[in-house]
Amino acid sequence: MDSRYNPATLEEKWQKTWVELGLDKTQTQSNKPKFYALSMFPYPSGSLHMGHVRNYTITDVIARLKRMQGYRVLHPMGWDAFGLPAENAAIDRGVPPAKWTYQNITQMRQQLQRLGLSIDWDSEVATCSPDYYKWTQWIFLQFLQAGLAYQKEAAVNWDPIDQTVLANEQVDNEGRSWRSGAIVERKLLRQWFLKITDYAEELLNDLDKLTGWPERVKLMQANWIGKSSGAYLEFPIVGSNEKIAVYTTRPDTVYGVSYVVLAPEHPLTKQVTTKTQQAAVDTFIQEVTNQSELERTAEDKPKRGIATGGKAINPFTGEEVPIWIADYVLYEYGTGAVMGVPAHDVRDFKFAQRYDLPIDFVIAAPDDVAGFDLSPTSETEEVTQVVQIEYNQAYTEPGILINSGAFTGMTSTDAKQAIVKYATEKGFGKERIQYRLRDWLISRQRYWGAPIPVIHCPNCGIVPVPDKDLPVILPEEVEFTGRGGSPLAQLESWVNVPCPTCGTPAKRETDTMDTFIDSSWYFLRFTDARNEAQVFESAKTNDWMPVDQYVGGIEHAILHLLYSRFFTKVLRDRGLLNFDEPFERLLTQGMVQGLTYFNPNKGGKDKWVPSHLVNPNDPRDPQTGEPLQRLYATMSKSKGNGVAPEDVIAKYGVDTARMFILFKAPPEKDLEWDEADVEGQFRFLNRVWRLVTDYVASGVNPKNKSGELSKSEKDLRRAIHTAIQSVTEDLEDDYQFNTAISELMKLSNALTDANGKDSRVYAEGIKTLVVLLAPFAPHIAEELWRLLGNSESVHTQTWPAFDPAALVADEITLVIQVNGKKRADIQVPSQADKAELEKYARESEVVQRHLEGKEIKKVIVVPGKLVNFVVG
């Protein structure tokens, strides 16, 4: 037996043994309750970072705990393997995307296995594997059959030099292509969409079912769906039979409309533009349509517009208002047109000030109209009194309507209903529910993604690829230049195929799917990962799902989680699933931050100084000698503040790295990397090692003496069962790993300080400490468990249950106060009642001195805590 803790040797040994024993295989015993523990799977970049280690360690602790608690556990891992980096590697280094990706997967799998995670690698999936994306394509066809997939024109980022579509991340802050440097244009292309809006209401309402999710994540999703209740109103165009439809959540402001605004892409822009304005309007539209949506809607940028020369009629007042085109109106939102009410909207107010447009206040604060008579003279007459009230900024609050015809004097709430009712009766409006959520654009003009499985036939139109012909395999004989559009579109031998329906020469769809498609159903495939005949066997998937605990970053709070919920509901409606929501509980772990140095006198990339170039005792810029400032920031290559997991493991071992990550901060909080604290956890594991190995080396046989336990034995047993209770509650209730480890430290200290190390209670304590440590530090726990003479793995042991009787102390410490000031504390029987506690307190010699010669006016007894004498 080695007297020193040598993590490298024992970790390698036990990882190999666990594989041989198959300890991490998914158990299928139907008599056990199931538990599905899942981390969000990674993109195979080639190397793990500390954020990965934190994510997977958290999930691993939960999975190990649940196995020991008697659950059959599914704890899989896979790879979100399609995406742009692999294609860029092909362009820059001439390495095929598949080769680059699978090399990275191999490397990262080895790194994950080095962490000793209890993952069932038999369930591993990679989204770029044909046996996975075959079913991604099959699911797409389910959407197509259900009428939930369709094509329409949509704007993309277009590089005019390379003649290719760019992802948003390939466009810099100046609107230039990352590769060619060309000013990026916006171009309309025919794109594929999924009708997520058909499920908007259910996606919103079912957030209430997610009681195990953080409230802020549910709020983010609700805001993204963006349900609003308002009105659809029509403004006739002067000199035309056409009408401009607008959507507004504030119909109560309609009498304050001073202009109507169209999106530059709106089909009525040409019709409403006069000849004198045509050239200026065309120029403006060209400028705006080359801007991204973010640029157009950024709050910190002034809103730009141009008058068309055309006019529309406010259907409530009969007055003509000018029609404008503005950059901030997006055609994809609402109707692509808005009514401008500068008096009651901040954005409209700034726009009106910039272009000198009228600002007419039609709602006022109740106190500001208290002196006006806003009552009609009869039921058939309107209020004719004009109320001259102006504010120096937009008044956006609800209030009392003024200068609003028959609706004057109403509250905003009442007026909204009355105005919509009036518009409905007159035929130029109606009530309408609107969602911010838009249909999901899934087309990507790239190679490294799942091909969309349809064929375009000149006779039959869009033809689904038959199931028997799936998967549509990505061809390997592709040239990657970064120019000329999608590489697939240039490969005629792949594009040109006969129509499956009529045999006519036809063409494959050359777009691939958004990689969010792949990650929107992977958790379902894990339940039946080797099924070659179907996407999954519904009985198996319905048995394992929903995921009991999902762990991942807050950055996925909206898109990935929303899309996964959408896919689950669609596949349920297709008869494949029998549940509504995919993830029962969600834990969004915080970021891992490193100590970061920066030169405040520099900017951009030059601002950051890699930590390995800095003397932490006197941090200075190695180039200029200027003093550096420091802060904690999320680890990244650009900041040079990262810590390589393999370096930490080589120095301290996997278990120490796990313990630090779990102990340093609650899981939902950001974690500041501090090597001193890493060393602290290493010292703790060394103490546990010595504690157990010294016990084993002593060769003591626990005495099974009969009769009552001694006081010290009772105290130790209470410490043992307090640890069991506290660690279990910390793990089960809210995953407070840091406080659970604190309890392990307390138990370790109690065992170190204990007398009678040959007692059966001490033996119970040693074994309990090792078992409780197992989910956190699995390798050292396994080694110590075997040293204690056990032949089976510690990870197959039953998680201990605390004995409530052991938690009850024979005696407690009673604090005695006189007029609220502590005067003494004494040991009293724990079962003493109020009268007995007062009696013990009065018998204290110290207290008697403080009470001598004084009148006791009141005695306050708090059972189990204190007695307070109030004296005069």
From Swiss-Prot:
A motif ('HIGH' region) lies at residues 42-52. Keywords: Aminoacyl-tRNA synthetase, ATP-binding, Cytoplasm, Ligase, Nucleotide-binding, Protein biosynthesis. Pfam families: Anticodon_1, tRNA-synt_1, tRNA-synt_1_2, tRNA-synt_1g. Its EC number is 6.1.1.4. ATP binds at residue 637. It is found in: Cytoplasm. GO terms for cellular component: cytosol. Belongs to the class-I aminoacyl-tRNA synthetase family. This is Leucine--tRNA ligase. It comes from Nostoc sp. (strain PCC 7120 / SAG 25.82 / UTEX 2576).
